[in-house]
Swiss-Prot record:
This is NADH-quinone oxidoreductase subunit K. Gene3D superfamilies: 1.10.287.3510. One of its GO terms (molecular function) is NADH:ubiquinone reductase (non-electrogenic) activity. NDH-1 shuttles electrons from NADH, via FMN and iron-sulfur (Fe-S) centers, to quinones in the respiratory chain. The immediate electron acceptor for the enzyme in this species is believed to be ubiquinone. Couples the redox reaction to proton translocation (for every two electrons transferred, four hydrogen ions are translocated across the cytoplasmic membrane), and thus conserves the redox energy in a proton gradient. Belongs to the complex I subunit 4L family. GO terms for biological process: ATP synthesis coupled electron transport. InterPro entries: NADH_UbQ_OxRdtase_chain4L/K, NUOK/Mnh_C1-like. Its main location: membrane. NDH-1 is composed of 14 different subunits. Subunits NuoA, H, J, K, L, M, N constitute the membrane sector of the complex. It comes from Thermomicrobium roseum (strain ATCC 27502 / DSM 5159 / P-2). It is found in: Cell membrane. It is a multi-pass membrane protein. It catalyses: a quinone + NADH + 5 H(+)(in) = a quinol + NAD(+) + 4 H(+)(out).
Amino acid sequence: MSELSATHFLLLSAALFIIGMVGVLTRRNVLVIFMCIELMLNAVNVSLIGFAWELHQLTGQVFALFVIAIAAAEAVVGLGIVMALTRRTDTVDIDELRQLRE
């Protein structure tokens, strides 16, 4: 069995980021788009941890903890906005929300 290297972490991170980006670009539900953005943030965390693993330093892991804390705050604010939009418009479809703007 081979040892983990930064390549393994970066491949996983790239796959997660691409899945999240495709979700943001193709989905119409605001909640699904929000979850895909969170997936992209987690992909960044995996890459930070991978670089920290390769360099044998804790800096990347500490920075990943800060990103997790910021993502939690972003999740609270984002879900609050989504809930307010849903109460006001009775929809979570991005196309219908665009029509309200026009």
